[in-house]
Amino acid sequence: MPPKEDPEITALKKELNDLVTKIKDEQKKAADCTLQEKCSDMGDVPKVRISTKKFLKGHINKVNSVHFAGDSRHCVTGSLDGKLIIWDTWTGNKVQVIPLRSAWVMSVAYADSGNFVACGGMDNMCTVYDLNNRDAQGNAKIVRELMGYEGFLSSCRFLDDTHIITGSGDLKICVWDLQAGKKTSEFDAHAGDVVSISMSADKNTYVTGSVDRTCKLWDVRESTPKQTFFGHEADVNSVCYHPSGFGFATGSEDKTARLFDFRSDQQIGHYEPPNKSSGFTSCALSLSGRYILCGSDDNNIHIWDTMKGQHNGALSGHENRITSICMAPNGMALASCSWDQNVRVWV
């Protein structure tokens, strides 16, 4: 028999649900029209015509994560073959191959400066490498191994060359000072695994997505969220800050992508593929914010017009589920990686 729930917890859960319902009712009152209605007189966007420009072959196991450097040319990928590969996406060449101590990598991050990369996963730590210095074996030198997590490392992003922010399966967010090798802050962020982090362009704020189905907006200096967003009916697998700085996009296990707005404090866009069969693992936005792109379990990258909500087609080519996509900072290319062991650069 399952254990009986404490009556106090039951009462608190009911109170919480009532408050959430009340918030949603207030939001509905404030929403005088939908984004689609407001944009109905806008012209349709042209169909996205991009194809695989570079096919990056080098990993020999599932590739779990990809992230661009600030130069929009180099990207890093992490795979279950126990390697990080730094790619030149313009030529398709490998720049560096970094062997990892643990093959169970789930997230990678490239510093905007191009000097450092970080990774982490089932080893419950975040490892930072200096790409400009080599160890005795000739591999990129380990700068820091950031330990102390009680769950897997699911997401990491550089604030600058000396600070990194991480999200993990122990529900926490940590900010680290890389020079000191110490946490500058650590706090419980969600009621479930913190799965995804996306930074604003100025690095002052960030958005998180979680298994608890919520997304939160944070100030890097504070340990309490500025705003919490509800709406998804399953894990939020990916969040992506809107280029305008006024909102963010999400991709979820509930087979939908959504657009949230900070100013109206609620969801303003809802996007579904033509055949709603697979969840979304990752999302990205075009530089203008007009297109939202989502990598899916159905091996495709789906595209929508964010304003009018129309499905704009899909990028196909991968032969297994897409695990991660990343838009180049200049908006000129999209990188994607998959369980098919390959990385593609779309232009």
Model-derived segments and spans:
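Loop/turn segments within WD40 beta-propeller blades
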Residues: 67-72, 109-114, 156-162, 180, ...
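Intrinsically disordered, low-complexity acidic/Ser/Thr/Pro-rich linker and tail segments
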Residues: 1-61
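Domain-scale macromolecular recognition modules
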Residues: 43-107, 116, 128, 172
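WD40-repeat beta-propellers
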Residues: 84-88, 126-131, 156, 173-177, ...
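Blade-level signature of beta-propeller repeat domains, shared across WD40, Kelch, NHL, RCC1
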Residues: 323-347
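Conserved strand-to-loop turn within each blade of WD40 beta-propeller repeats
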Residues: 78-81, 120-123, 167-170, 208-212, ...
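WD40/WD-repeat beta-propeller blade N-cap
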Residues: 56-63, 99-105, 146-153, 188-194, ...
